[in-house]
UniProtKB/Swiss-Prot annotation:
Belongs to the glucose-1-phosphate cytidylyltransferase family. Substrate binds at residues 6-13, 23, 104, 109, 128. The gene is rfbF. Homohexamer. This is Glucose-1-phosphate cytidylyltransferase. Keywords: Lipopolysaccharide biosynthesis, Magnesium, Metal-binding, Nucleotide-binding, Nucleotidyltransferase, Transferase. Pathway: Nucleotide-sugar biosynthesis; CDP-3,6-dideoxy-D-mannose biosynthesis; CDP-3,6-dideoxy-D-mannose from CTP and alpha-D-glucose 1-phosphate: step 1/5; Bacterial outer membrane biogenesis; LPS O-antigen biosynthesis.
Length: 257
């Protein structure tokens, strides 16, 4: 199964770093948060990734084009015009980088990569700025079992997100503000049937608005409830928090060796 990751946003609340790189390339523990997200999927057997590039997308392309340089020790034999890579660290990934426009909204970016998932039974979809100790395989199994078009991961918020109205596992509506403590939110990790892309009109469509709301109204949106760790990296404070967890060896999303 393929995983589509949005990686084209500006990241204005992390402007100290995103002035020179896209938000998914902001580092946690010396590696881009995009890498952390891909490792989260990879540990569950996901090897095919489609990255929706936009703002400063060339930075992402350069990273993967020179992956050995970023991940390994190297010796440059200058007179021989040769590079020797030591202790190669390679991932079993197939990474497709797609330019989805500098100003496209989240739905527009997904629509632009439709050709890469159109023949699949289902695919995974997430944002390039959040991590969780999520059981990816369990979300896939849940999606296959209920037979609806879309599954989102419902989680508990740090405190500033709109809430979901979930009844018997089905998302009935979105609410601008939580009803109170205990309300779950859209955690941004999806399992989708390709047909949901038909609900996206154009580049200006926001995935979290019309498409998701329509799926909820049609009874085609189910919630996989994740009570564990979940944390987006929206602000510098979020980055510092995640960096601290990583440095202390207490990063809950690190389920790989």
């Amino acid at each position: 199964m393929k995983a589509v990751i949005l990686a084209g946003g500006l990241g204005t609340r992390l402007s100290e770093e995103t002035i020179v790189k896209p938000k998914p390339m902001v580092e946690i523990g010396g590696k881009p948060i995009l890498w952390h997200i891909m490792k989260m999927y990879s540990v569950h057997g996901i090897k095919d990734f489609i990255i929706c590039c936009g703002y400063k997308g060339y930075v992402i392309k350069e990273y993967f084009a020179n992956y050995f340089l970023h991940m390994s020790d190297v010796t440059f034999h200058m007179a021989e015009n040769r590079m020797e890579v030591h202790h190669k660290r390679v991932e079993p990934w197939n990474v497709t980088l797609v330019d989805t426009g500098d100003s496209s909204m989240t739905g527009g970016r997904l629509k632009r990569v439709a050709e890469y998932v159109k023949d699949d039974e289902a695919f995974l979809f997430t944002y390039g700025d959040g991590v969780a100790d999520l059981d990816i395989k369990a979300t896939i199994d849940f999606h296959k079992a209920h037979g609806k078009k879309a599954t989102l991961t419902a989680t508990f918020p740090p405190g500033r997100f709109g809430a979901l109205d979930i009844r018997a596992g089905q998302v009935r509506s979105f609410q601008e503000k939580p009803k109170g403590d205990g309300a779950m939110i859209n955690g941004g990790f999806f399992v989708l049937n390709p047909s949901v892309i038909d609900l996206i009109d154009n580049d200006a469509t926001t995935w979290e608005q019309e498409p998701l709301m329509t799926l909820a109204q049609q009874g085609e949106l189910m919630a996989f409830e994740h009570p564990g760790f979940w944390q987006p990296m929206d602000t510098l404070r979020d980055k510092v928090y995640l960096e601290g967890l990583w440095e202390k060896g207490k990063a809950p999303w690190k389920t790989w060796e």
